[in-house]
Amino acid sequence: VYLFAPYDTQGRTCRYNPLSYISKDKAFQISDIDSISAAIFSTKVGSDEFWSDQAKDMFRGLCLFVLEQPELPHTLGEMFRQASGKGKPLKDHLQQTVEAKQKEGKPFSSACIDCLNRVITMPDNTFGSVVATFNSKMKMFQNVLVDMATSDNDFDLRDVRKKKLTIYFGITPNKLA
């Protein structure tokens, strides 16, 4: 029996990291990432989907950006931290990291570069709005408790139908928004 309660002020929660379920096979990575981004950046019928779709592209790029750097934690919290620009403007941070990895002989995948380029080549006003949309949905990972609760796995969701496994979600209504 597991209780996933990422906002528990005592830290009494099991951990669940959605990024750990992304396939290592490049052929399936984007669809796995898209499944996660669809849950985070859901759009209401009839709403302007443009900003949400662009934020999903940013999510795709940053997810690959994090996953392709073994020295970084492969977590949603790390994606949010990378989106801050790490003390630099975000465009500069991403471009400088891409260039540095290229020089080290450890270039990012073309899928990662393509996703990032679609976002960082936008005009500044558009880019700023996309980053704001991304941050508005990802800011929950700035919370130390949520970041910790999504940093690793204490159970494997793939075992749900194979083993006797019960997972409770302990999230109060005011945190569901």
For each of these PLM feature ranges, what is it?
Residues 1-177:
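P-loop NTPase motor domains
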